[in-house]
A protein has these predicted regions:
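Mature extracytoplasmic or organellar-lumen-exposed domains after removal of signal/transit peptides
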Residues: 1-201
C-alpha cells in the first residue's frame, strides 16, 4: 500500500501532474539557488526515482532485472564491475521490480516501456537547455507522461490480479486442510492483494 500511496501517487499525481502542468514552475529557472538543474528536471527525476528502475535496466532482459532484486544475478547488477552492487544506481526497486516480474513471462513489456518513456521525457527537458519548454515540447512530454501513467497503472492492476488468484488458491487449501503455515501464506497474499488494490483508488 505504501508503494501506491507514496511512490505511485507522488509520481503520477504530483511530479508528473501538477509539477508538469501549464502554469507550474517553468524550466528556465534553477530548482533552487545554486542548483545546476531546473525545477522540471528535478520533478521528472523524482518521479523516475519512485518508479525504481536501475540505471542500466534497458540494457538487461526482464529476467535479469527481476533477478537483480531477488539477488540472484549480481553480475548483471554490477554495471561498473567494481565487485559490489550500488543500491542507489544498480538495483531495481518497487514497481519497476514488479514490472520485470510480469515481463519475464514474455507477454508484457512494462519495465522497458515506462523506463524508456522516462528517459525520452528527460531528454526533452534537458534539450531545452534551461529555457522554457515550447508548445511542441510540452505536448511531447505529455505523451510520455500518458505512457508512463497507463503502464504503471497496469503493473499495479496485474499485481492485484496475481494476488487475487493466490488468495483464491490459499482459501481452497485452507478449506481442504487447515494449518498455521497455510494460513500464514494466505495472510501474506491477502495483505499484498489489499495493498495493491488500495493503491489503485
Amino acid at each position: 500500500f505504501a508503494m501506491g500511496a507514496v511512490f505511485y501517487n507522488q509520481a503520477v499525481d504530483n511530479y508528473l501532474d501538477e509539477k508538469m502542468a501549464p502554469g507550474s514552475k517553468t524550466n528556465d529557472k534553477p530548482y533552487k539557488d545554486g542548483a545546476y538543474y531546473t525545477y522540471k528536471e528535478h520533478a521528472w527525476d523524482e518521479a523516475f526515482g519512485y518508479w525504481g528502475a536501475v540505471g542500466h535496466g534497458l540494457g538487461l532482459n526482464a529476467k535479469q532485472n527481476y533477478n537483480i532484486t531477488k539477488m540472484k544475478d549480481m553480475a548483471a547488477a554490477d554495471q561498473n564491475k567494481d565487485g559490489v552492487v550500488d543500491l542507489k544506481s544498480e538495483y531495481n526497486f518497487a514497481h519497476a521490480y514488479y514490472a520485470s516480474s510480469f515481463d519475464k513471462g514474455g507477454k508484457t513489456n512494462y519495465y522497458n516501456t515506462v523506463t524508456q518513456a522516462f528517459l525520452d521525457g528527460r531528454k526533452i527537458i534537458a534539450g531545452a537547455k534551461g529555457e522554457k519548454l515550447s508548445s511542441s515540447e510540452k505536448a511531447a512530454l505529455q505523451g510520455h507522461i500518458a505512457t508512463i501513467n497507463a503502464n504503471w497503472e497496469k503493473v499495479i492492476a496485474e499485481s492485484v490480479f496475481k494476488y487475487a488468484g493466490s488468495v483464491y488458491k490459499d482459501i481452497v487449501k485452507l478449506e481442504e486442510n487447515y494449518s498455521d503455515k497455510a494460513f500464514a501464506t494466505y495472510a501474506k497474499h491477502w495483505g499484498e492483494l489489499k495493498g495493491f488494490a488500495m493503491a489503485l483508488q
